[in-house]
A protein has these predicted regions:
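Flavin-dependent oxidoreductase catalytic cores
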Residues: 1-314
Length: 314
C-alpha cells in the first residue's frame, strides 16, 4: 500500500472511505426541472471514476418552495426527485465511492420574484447585499414548517440511496439564525448563543429521527464571520464544540468569512491569483479544539497542498 497520506483509508462513522480525497458540494447548474438527470449524473459519476473517496453533490439542494434557487439547483422538496437520486447514487457506488448531498434553505439569500413568488424569510428584516430582497421576519409556524421540510428532504435523500447529508449553514438560513448580525428574534430562537443555535439543532434532531443512526449528517458552517458584531473566532469555537457535543452530527466542515458581498465571497472561495489554502490553519485549530472529524475546502487546488494538510495533522 502506498505511504501517501492522501491515499490512506479513513473511517467516518460506519463508512470506510478508500482515501482522504473528497469532492465537496458545488452546483454545476446541470439539473433539468430541478432533477439530477443524465448530464448531472454523468458529471457526478466522473468523480467516482477518478478515484475520490466521496463526492458531495448539489450546492445546495432546496428543501422548501420559499427557498427558490437563484440559479439552476436541485429541488429536494419534490417527491419525484427520489428515483433520479437513486440512479445517481447507484452509479457512484458501483465505482466504489460514497456520495452525499448538501441541503439548504436559503433564507434571505435569494429573491421573492423567482420560483413560486413566495415571500423570502429570515430572522430579521435585514436584506443581503448580494441579493437585495427584503425578507419577511420569520414566524413560529414558518420555523415549524421549515424544520419539517428539512426532515422530509432528508427522508427522500436516504430513500434515494445517499450515504449522508450535509447542511449548508454559512450565509444561508441556518447561519442567519446563528449570527447575531442577522438574528433579531425574541424568545427561544433569538438572543443568547444557545437560542440562536436552537434552529440548527432542531433541524438536525428532526433529520436524525427520520434517517436513523446508520446515516452520515454533517454541517458546512462558518466559525468566524470576520465581521464586526458577527460570529467571531471565540464564539465560533464554542459553536463547533456545541455542534459536536449535540451528538447529532458526524463531522464538521468549517470555513471562515462571510458570503453576503462579492468581496466576502472571494475570501471564502478564493479565485485564481489569490493565496492557496488561506483558512487551512484556522480549520486545523477547530479540529484540534474539538477532536472531531473536520473537513475543509477553500482553494486546496493541488495535490501538494492537500497532502500537507493531511500529513501535518491540520
Amino acid at each position: 500500500m502506498s505511504n501517501d497520506p492522501l491515499l490512506q483509508p479513513y473511517r467516518l462513522k460506519h463508512l470506510t472511505l478508500r482515501n482522504r480525497i473528497i469532492v465537496t458540494s458545488h452546483e454545476p447548474a446541470y439539473p433539468e426541472d430541478g432533477m439530477p438527470k443524465g448530464r448531472y449524473r454523468a458529471y457526478t459519476v466522473e468523480r467516482a471514476k477518478g478515484g475520490v473517496a466521496m463526492t458531495m453533490t448539489a450546492g445546495s439542494a432546496a428543501v422548501s418552495k420559499d427557498s427558490p434557487p437563484v440559479f439552476n439547483n436541485l429541488l429536494a422538496y419534490k417527491d419525484e426527485i427520489v428515483p433520479w437520486i437513486r440512479e445517481m447514487t447507484d452509479a457512484v457506488h458501483e465505482e466504489g465511492a460514497a456520495i452525499m448531498i448538501q441541503l439548504t434553505h436559503l433564507g434571505r439569500r435569494t429573491r421573492w420574484d423567482k420560483g413560486d413568488w413566495l415571500p423570502i424569510l429570515a430572522p430579521s428584516h435585514h436584506r443581503e447585499s448580494a441579493h437585495r430582497a427584503f425578507p419577511k421576519k420569520i414566524e413560529d409556524w414558518d420555523i415549524e414548517r421549515i424544520i419539517k421540510d428539512f426532515a422530509d428532504a432528508a427522508e427522500r435523500m436516504k430513500a434515494g440511496g445517499m450515504d449522508g447529508i450535509e447542511l449548508e449553514a454559512y450565509g444561508h438560513l441556518i447561519d442567519q439564525f446563528v449570527s447575531p448580525l442577522t438574528n433579531e428574534l425574541d424568545g427561544p430562537y433569538g438572543g443568547s448563543l444557545e437560542n440562536r443555535m436552537r434552529f440548527c439543532l432542531d433541524v438536525f434532531k428532526a433529520m436524525r429521527e427520520r434517517v436513523g443512526d446508520d446515516f452520515i449528517l454533517g454541517v458546512r458552517y462558518t466559525a468566524d464571520e470576520c465581521l464586526e458584531g458577527g460570529t467571531g473566532k471565540a464564539e465560533g469555537l464554542e459553536i463547533s464544540r456545541r455542534l459536536k457535543d449535540s451528538g447529532l452530527i458526524d463531522y464538521l466542515n468549517v470555513i471562515r468569512g462571510h458570503i453576503d458581498t462579492d468581496p466576502g465571497l472571494t475570501d471564502v472561495i478564493p479565485i485564481q491569483g489569490m493565496t492557496s489554502a488561506p483558512h487551512l490553519d484556522f480549520a486545523g485549530e477547530i479540529r484540534a479544539a474539538t477532536s472531531f472529524p473536520t473537513f475543509h475546502a477553500a482553494k486546496i487546488q493541488d495535490v501538494a497542498t492537500a497532502r500537507y494538510a493531511i500529513a501535518s495533522g491540520k
